[in-house]
A protein has these predicted regions:
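Short hydrophobic/aromatic-rich motifs at helix boundaries and adjacent loops
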Residues: 29-31, 66-67
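Long, amphipathic alpha-helical surface segments
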Residues: 1-18, 24-26, 33-51, 56-59, ...
């Protein structure tokens, strides 16, 4: 028997960690949070961003040499990990090897030859320039 409103709502609404359509067809997540009518707050968006950044930073667990890069170049890899997931960015084996060797112009060109570059457009061009130059873009 539920002993709080929280427990009752969890029972009645259920817990959904991925978006779903509720009984009226509204996109919903969590415990009955209607994304279409309520959305999320700024604090919730920042919390999600912080969680996603922590996940992106885990790329360093697989690339210990990343800490030797200057901040702008290191953040190119983090940005890509944020977008693609850690495993996705680890699939850029040639690019990452070129970065590790300090061959940034070639690494940037390799980034731009990828399917990812076609998908994200200007983002890839900006990040490739940042990788090449070591300057924030």
């Amino acid at each position: 028997m539920p002993s709080s409103l929280r427990e009752t709502l969890l029972r009645d609404e259920g817990l959904h960690l991925k978006p779903y359509r509720d009984s009226r067809g509204f996109l919903t997540i969590g415990v009955g949070r209607c994304l279409e009518t309520k959305g999320i707050s700024m604090a919730e968006a920042e919390m999600l961003l912080d969680n996603d950044l922590r996940e992106a930073f885990r790329v360093a667990d697989h690339l210990p040499w990343i800490t030797d890069l200057d901040e702008p170049r290191r953040n190119v890899i983090y940005n890509m990990a944020f977008n693609l997931g850690v495993q996705g960015v680890l699939g850029f084996t040639k690019t990452l090897e070129l970065v590790k060797q300090g061959r940034y112009v070639e690494a940037a060109a390799e980034m731009l030859r990828s399917e990812w570059a076609k998908q994200v457009g200007n983002r890839s061009e900006r990040l490739a320039l940042q990788m090449e130059s070591g300057l924030w873009r």
